[in-house]
């Protein structure tokens, strides 16, 4: 390069650097404005969320707020109130990035006191610049966004409305936010709490809840997935495939085409368990039960036996086979021997317990007649009785005639044969003062004989 061209090159380089510096400065300003705008948009969204929560709170408590406000005296809603009632999350801060605190002032409409209107106003903290207020007023999406520039009046975005703060009993200063909630807005909020929504609204389960009875006007509820209720009253039929009940099922009557299975007892308070067509009660496990197949007999299923530790009682009891007893047969009625009876073959007893049988139309004692036994017996033995007889039916005697002992000089007495109350025999003879017991030997001591006669 020639020396006379070097000055121009330096000038060109300096100009380029100047342009670059100007572009950097301009870009930095643009970036700063962008960051500020994003921050103000975020603040506007937070104000919108707060205002939406206040709107819902007013709608749900519309009647209460009517009673606590007038056209000049407001009911004031704070952030704490919205958090405590669940309209704002517990993590929502009490102030914004500039330290301003939001409150809603609710008053009655002057022209129509039955309606409510409200204004959300920020107070305290650091004032926003006008540029920020204008930007945020346009970005607020709930209610009519605005701002306070003179400390007395709330002005809407694009200066679309202007309202004195005193109309709502509110106080604030320059550089603060204001949001107007009109009577229409709050009436809609009140209707939201009363309207049943067809679709789910996130965070608003109350919009899908009925707070009173609903009358379908005899119309149907179709394609219902599940019906959960405390009670149900039906004037017609209830049709279904299966049913599960954790409590009681009550009704005047019930008809089932197939089976009824119960996990517990089946009880009837005042009625019968009625079956038809030769059916009755059956124990499925053991195959026994009761049924009737004709008009006369209650039958045992599969000819099962009937077992009880108590009594079986009836007018007559008939056994087609043998009649067994594990103890005794007790006949309670008595008959009189010689009296008439029918039919032959009856068995009875008299008042002493003796067995009677009906023979040829007359009650007769069984095995009537007498029995006599005789024998020899030694001293000290008991007179025996015939088999099957008691002492009250018999009489007996003993004698010592087989070995008599006559009188001898100096002898006190002769032979002896007696018995006591227990039929114990004293048999022998006296030799002066000495008694000799009778034995079975054929010696001088001798032996006694007995005779026993018994009558049935």
UniProtKB/Swiss-Prot annotation:
Protein name: Shufflon protein D'
Signal peptide: none
Lineage, uppermost ranks: Bacteria, Pseudomonadati, Pseudomonadota, Gammaproteobacteria, Enterobacterales
Coiled coil: none
Keyword annotations from UniProtKB, A to Z: Plasmid
Pfam families: Shufflon_N
Miscellaneous field: This protein is expressed by a shufflon (= clustered inversion region that works as a biological switch). The orfs of this region share a constant N-terminus, while the C-terminus is variable.
Region feature (Constant region): 1-361
InterPro entries named among the record's database cross-references: Enolase-like_N, Shufflon_N
Chain spans, region Variable region: 362-456
């Amino acid at each position: 390069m020639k020396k006379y061209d070097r000055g121009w090159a330096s000038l060109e380089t300096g100009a380029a650097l100047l342009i670059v510096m100007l572009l950097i400065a301009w870009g930095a300003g643009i970036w700063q404005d962008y960051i500020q705008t994003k921050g103000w948009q975020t603040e506007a969204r937070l104000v919108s969320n707060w205002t939406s929560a206040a709107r819902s709170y007013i709608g749900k408590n519309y009647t209460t707020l009517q009673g606590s406000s007038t056209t000049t005296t407001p009911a004031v809603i704070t952030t704490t109130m919205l958090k405590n009632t669940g309209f704002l999350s517990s993590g929502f801060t009490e102030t914004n990035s500039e330290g301003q605190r939001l409150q809603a002032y609710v008053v009655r409409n002057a022209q129509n006191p039955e309606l409510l209107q409200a204004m959300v106003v920020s107070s305290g903290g650091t004032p926003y610049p006008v540029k920020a207020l204008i930007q945020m007023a346009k970005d607020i999406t709930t209610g009519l966004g605005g701002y306070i520039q003179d400390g007395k009046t709330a002005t809407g975005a694009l200066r679309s409305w202007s309202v004195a703060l005193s109309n709502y009993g509110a106080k604030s200063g320059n550089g603060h936010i204001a949001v107007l909630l009109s009577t229409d807005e709050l009436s809609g909020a009140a209707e939201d709490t009363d309207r049943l929504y067809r679709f789910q609204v996130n965070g608003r389960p109350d919009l899908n809840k009925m707070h009173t009875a609903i009358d379908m006007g005899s119309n149907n509820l179709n394609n219902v997935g599940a019906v959960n209720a405390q009670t149900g009253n039906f004037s017609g039929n209830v049709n279904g495939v299966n049913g599960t009940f954790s409590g009681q099922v009550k009704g005047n009557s019930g008809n089932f085409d197939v089976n009824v299975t119960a996990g517990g007892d089946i009880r009837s308070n005042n009625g019968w368990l009625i079956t038809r067509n030769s059916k009755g009660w059956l124990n499925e496990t053991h195959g026994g039960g009761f049924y009737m197949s004709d008009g006369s007999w209650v039958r045992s299923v599969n000819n099962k036996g009937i077992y009880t530790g108590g009594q079986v009682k009836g007018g007559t009891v008939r056994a087609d086979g043998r009649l067994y007893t594990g103890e005794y047969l007790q006949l309670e009625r008595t008959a009189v021997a010689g009296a008439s009876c029918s039919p032959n073959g009856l068995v009875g007893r008299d008042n002493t317990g003796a067995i009677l049988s009906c023979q040829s139309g007359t009650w007769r004692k069984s095995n009537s007649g007498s029995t006599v036994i005789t024998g020899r017996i030694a001293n000290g033995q008991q007179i025996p009785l015939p088999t099957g007889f008691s002492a009250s039916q018999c009489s007996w005697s003993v004698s010592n005639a087989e070995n008599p002992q006559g009188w001898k000089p100096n002898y006190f007495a002769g032979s002896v044969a007696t018995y006591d109350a227990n039929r114990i025999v004293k048999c022998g003879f006296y030799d002066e003062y000495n008694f000799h017991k009778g034995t079975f030997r054929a010696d001088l001591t001798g032996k006694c004989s007995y005779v026993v006669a018994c009558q049935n």
